Amino acid sequence: MAMTIQLDVVSAEDSIFSGLVQSIQVTGSEGELGVQYGHAPLLTTIKAGMVNVVKQHGEEELIYVAGGVLEVQPGHISVLADTALRAGDLDEQAVLEAKKRLEENIANPSADFEYAEAAAELAETIAQLRLIQKLRK
């Protein structure tokens, strides 16, 4: 049996996941990161994207996160996300509409337009779409 480690994924609103896992994959500030039992202690920021969780008995669960912090300690992994949603809770139609609206705003900016903010929101919606597409496979 594979070695396991405790994982807690929480957002400001809710606890999304808590349990023993074999490993997780997440997008950190420096790129893709895999964590499993025995990983060196680590603290890094995370980007909008998917947390791929391999649970204790090998089942996979996908969680969308947008911003936050990943902390790895001996025996424990914490994902403290600004936003976190189970992949199944994402509404594809709403995400597609948000993406279209953001692309239109970027193409035709208003006087009080904040490009950096719009680009960050667009990156989040694209990450959500990637996760939805991965769920379909």
UniProtKB/Swiss-Prot annotation:
Origin: domain of life: Bacteria
Membrane topology listed for this record: Peripheral membrane protein
Keyword tags: ATP synthesis, Cell inner membrane, Cell membrane, CF(1), Hydrogen ion transport, Ion transport, Membrane, Transport
Pfam name, any one: ATP-synt_DE
Protein name as it appears in the record: ATP synthase epsilon chain
Family named by the database record: Belongs to the ATPase epsilon chain family.
Function: Produces ATP from ADP in the presence of a proton gradient across the membrane.
Record's subcellular location: Cell inner membrane
InterPro entries for this protein: ATP_F1_dsu/esu_C_sf, ATP_synth_F1_dsu/esu, ATP_synth_F1_dsu/esu_N, ATP_synth_F1_esu_C, ATPsynth_dsu/esu_N
Keyword Membrane: yes
Molecular function, one GO term: ATP binding
A GO CC term assigned to this protein in UniProt: proton-transporting ATP synthase complex
Keyword hit for Transferase: no
Gene3D superfamilies for this protein: ATP synthase delta/epsilon subunit, C-terminal domain (1.20.5.440), F0F1 ATP synthase delta/epsilon subunit, N-terminal (2.60.15.10)
Cited SUPFAM superfamilies: Epsilon subunit of F1F0-ATP synthase C-terminal domain (SSF46604), Epsilon subunit of F1F0-ATP synthase N-terminal domain (SSF51344)
Self-association state and partner proteins as the record states: F-type ATPases have 2 components, CF(1) - the catalytic core - and CF(0) - the membrane proton channel. CF(1) has five subunits: alpha(3), beta(3), gamma(1), delta(1), epsilon(1). CF(0) has three main subunits: a, b and c.
Source organism: Pseudoalteromonas atlantica (strain T6c / ATCC BAA-1087)
